[in-house]
Amino acid sequence: MVGEWVSFPTDRETIQGVFQRIGLEHGGEYFITDYDSSLPLSEMLGEYENLNELNYFAHNLQSVAADGNLEKFSAALELGDNTGRLKDLINLTDNMDAYTWLPGITTENSYGQYLVDACEAIPVLLEHPEIEPYFDYEAFGRDTTINESGTFTKDGYIVQDGNFTEEYHSFEDIPKEYMITPEVSGEALTEAAAEMSMML
């Protein structure tokens, strides 16, 4: 079998050149042997992913990074919701506004303090600062985390506190400029199948 690394996002001309070099210029079957990314995506993406969807996802990731939300996206991956399929990951890139990301808030205690200080969640503490030493910030942060199903990462706190307003359903939703190939079957592999590795 012949294989080649492909960096995504890519374009139609590049992927056609790859197909020619690995023997798929007249159609055939492929599978993806590996993924390389600064994000923990390799466990979430499979060997039979659609190349047009991968390209669309990679373009969306570029937009997420350009908006300064790559750290937030990475934290949302750790949260573990909406990561089961490539379709879910595409929807995740389109709905970063549904998440609140608090960089630097990495413990229940620091989250409890944030809620009290920044959000004024416990007005009585502002009115009577003398009782603050007796307040259990850690327990408050822990209970709030449980109630809102948030999670701590090594870099901060992430919670989904909004609804998805954009939804990707199928290939028909991919803008034409991100389509790089007519579908080449990624199923029913044979010994003559070609292999590709993706860099996202």
Annotate each PLM feature.
Residues 13-86:
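Structured domain cores in non-transmembrane regions
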Residues 111-113, 117-185:
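Mixed-charge, low-complexity intrinsically disordered segments
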Residues 136, 184-200:
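Non-Sec secretion/translocation targeting segments of pathogen effectors
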Residues 5-8, 44, 169-170:
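Short amphipathic beta-strand/extended segments with alternating polar/hydrophobic composition
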Residues 2-7, 29-34, 149-160:
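Ordered hydrophobic segments in well-structured contexts
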